[in-house]
Amino acid sequence: MEVEFDFRKRHYRAKITNGEYVYERTFRGKEGMIKDVWSNDKFKRMIDQEEVKLNQENMRTYRTATNSVIYFALLPFNLDDPVVNRQLMRSVEIKGKSYYKVEMTYGKNGGGEDFEDVYVYWINKEDFTIDYLAYSYNINGGGVRFREAYNSREIEGIRFQDYKNYTIYKDFPAQELDYAFETDQLKLISNIELENVRVDLTSSLVEKR
């Protein structure tokens, strides 16, 4: 499977086959045409088709930026990964609709560098769509985000959504952000909108790890 889309003047591509994946981010920077490539266990940055050497801090920053955008774009893909720890919480109502509330964390072994992050998903009890999600993170000083889905559409049978992106003070528990949303405590900071989405279900993985 291959998925491509544009997000904030950057082009993203995900190629996934039998557990192998290659995530790519391409954009024009001051140095030239930049292409970040993140596969199962390797990251590299190309500038004008030449690989450049990166220190560990920059490598992590670029890798996280590439991975996080594609991760959220492809939800709920990968939520059944063996390293995911799931906890069904108390069901809640948001805007008059009933939701299953599921907390997810990642194991230290196989969960990546951000294994301490916490994710919460609100799953509609009627159609089982993820209408809301939240997460806490520790990089760059930490913080929390709450996202409200809109513009849901299916392309080649795969559901894509855009999101209204909210925040509150960084120590607020991600698990309680539904309450903060319902009581108008959150601040809207951006919209997460995917453009020019394309799906090729017949594509095989070209670049092996």
What name fits each language-model region?
Residues 195-209:
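Gram-negative outer-membrane assembly/targeting C-terminal domains
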